[in-house]
């Protein structure tokens, strides 16, 4: 008998919840809008989606989303569905069509959000997952313990390759561990990819010869498949140790193809995540979403940051990071490294460390480093000092007595 995939949803409906659950199950498996003689009991038993659980929560007077059936009461519930793996086989795109396809558009539904996903070993074992993960990333970055201290090239776009390389030079002078392109910086006319990689890697390789370790730079290779392969190969040939892709831009198939080709860690940027999560009555929670990208082979996954510049609450950020650090299942851990970013400074270090319970993470600060009044190297040292304090259980003020860079940073980290 085929193992099953289980997906859990928050659901709102103006109709009978049990009937709506059956409509969703039918739409996402063997059913259609009319009864068919060919949809036999045996076929439904073998291939149909099952309603595993339906827990009523509460009701509302108005619908969360427009365009559905009119009603004087809208019932909210937790719905769990399951499907046999044989319906779609070991395919991420076809899994996506099943668990997150037409069901969001059904007129019976006035709210639907995918909140959990359980994948059996018969599915997860078909995927290689991250090639490097936490241990491989630490080895390449030369950071055996503690957080990987990182940044984003700023301004995000508009610098030339030479100006970018100069920023990298200043960051390395501050002993940075990790540098990434902004998601907007790919292969524009002012900063062509090849010229940028060569200019930056000259600086990185020269510094590595002197420092004994090489800073990890995540170059944004996002593009068409052939472009991404060529860009990856250039980074590898120049001695680079990481490539970055924008996940929603290239999709699961794009990531899988790069995973098959790559000899470097894949840094996964979640640009566009807001349209999937921001409406609480529609879309995805991060926990099920990130599973698919880890299966596809992503080594680092952005999770936003505490007290960020966006709209996401701290509790959601923490849940996202914990999800990335959790094994997919007992047969396939597929661990990846959470990346904290967005309005980050050293002030978030202690709370981040306490919430996650470990330092297996990349903490990137753009303005929090580049805006330091004493310059970029001092900005790097200030962030590192903040993490020393966090891991030692000391206050920033106490650590600042030993770190002039941190002391001056406290005035502009607001």
Curated annotation (Swiss-Prot):
This is 3-oxo-isoapionate-4-phosphate transcarboxylase/hydrolase. PANTHER family: RIBULOSE BISPHOSPHATE CARBOXYLASE, RIBULOSE BISPHOSPHATE CARBOXYLASE LARGE CHAIN. Belongs to the RuBisCO large chain family. Its EC number is 3.7.1.28. The keyword Metal-binding applies. The modification N6-carboxylysine is found at residue 180. Keywords: Carbohydrate metabolism, Hydrolase, Magnesium, Metal-binding. Mg(2+) binds at residues 180, 182-183. Gene3D superfamilies: Ribulose bisphosphate carboxylase, large subunit, C-terminal domain, RuBisCO large subunit, N-terminal domain. Signal peptide: none annotated. Coiled coil: none annotated. Its cofactor is Mg(2+). Pathway: Carbohydrate metabolism. Involved in catabolism of D-apiose. Catalyzes the conversion of 3-oxo-isoapionate 4-phosphate to 3-phosphoglycerate and glycolate. GO terms for molecular function: hydrolase activity; magnesium ion binding; ribulose-bisphosphate carboxylase activity. It catalyses: 3-oxoisoapionate 4-phosphate + H2O = (2R)-3-phosphoglycerate + glycolate + H(+). It comes from Xanthobacter autotrophicus (strain ATCC BAA-1158 / Py2). GO terms for biological process: carbon fixation.
């Amino acid at each position: 008998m085929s193992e099953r995939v289980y997906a859990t949803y928050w659901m709102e409906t103006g109709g009978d919840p049990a009937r709506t659950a059956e409509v969703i199950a039918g739409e996402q498996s063997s059913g259609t809008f009319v009864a068919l003689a060919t949809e036999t009991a045996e076929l439904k038993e073998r291939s149909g989606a099952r309603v595993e659980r339906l827990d009523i929560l509460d009701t509302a007077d108005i619908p969360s989303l427009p365009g559905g059936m009119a009603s004087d009461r809208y019932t909210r519930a937790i719905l769990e569905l399951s499907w046999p793996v044989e319906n779609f086989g070991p395919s991420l795109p076809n899994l996506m069509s099943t668990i997150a396809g037409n069901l969001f558009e059904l007129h019976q539904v006035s709210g639907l959000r995918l909140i959990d996903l359980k994948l059996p070993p018969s599915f997860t074992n078909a995927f290689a997952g991250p090639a490097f993960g936490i241990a491989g990333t630490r080895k390449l970055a030369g950071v055996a313990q503690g957080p990987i201290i990182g940044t984003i090239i700023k301004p995000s776009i508009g610098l030339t390759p030479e100006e970018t390389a100069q920023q990298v030079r200043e960051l390395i002078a501050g002993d940075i561990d990790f540098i990434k392109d902004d998601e907007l910086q790919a292969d524009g006319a002012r900063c062509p990819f090849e010229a940028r990689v060569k200019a930056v890697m000259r600086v990185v390789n020269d510094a590595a010869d002197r420092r004994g370790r090489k800073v990890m730079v995540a170059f944004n290779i996002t593009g068409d498949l052939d472009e991404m392969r060529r860009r990856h190969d250039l980074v590898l040939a120049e001695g680079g140790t990481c490539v970055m892709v924008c996940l929603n831009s290239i999709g699961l198939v794009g990531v899988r193809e790069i995973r098959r080709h790559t000899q470097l860690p894949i840094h996964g940027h979640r640009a566009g995540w807001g349209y999937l999560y921001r409406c609480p009555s529609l879309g995805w929670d991060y926990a099920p979403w990130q599973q698919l990208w880890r299966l596809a082979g992503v080594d680092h996954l952005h999770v936003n940051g505490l007290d960020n510049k966006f709209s996401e609450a701290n509790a959601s950020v923490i849940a996202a990071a914990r999800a990335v650090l959790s094994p997919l299942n007992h047969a396939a851990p597929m661990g990846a490294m959470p990346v904290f970013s967005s309005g980050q400074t050293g002030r978030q270090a202690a709370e981040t460390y306490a919430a996650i319970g470990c330092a297996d993470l990349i903490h990137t600060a753009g303005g929090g480093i580049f805006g330091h009044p004493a310059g970029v190297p001092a900005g790097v040292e200030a962030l590192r000092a903040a993490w020393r304090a966090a891991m030692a259980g000391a206050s920033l003020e106490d650590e600042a007595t030993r770190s002039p860079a941190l002391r001056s940073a406290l005035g502009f980290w607001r």
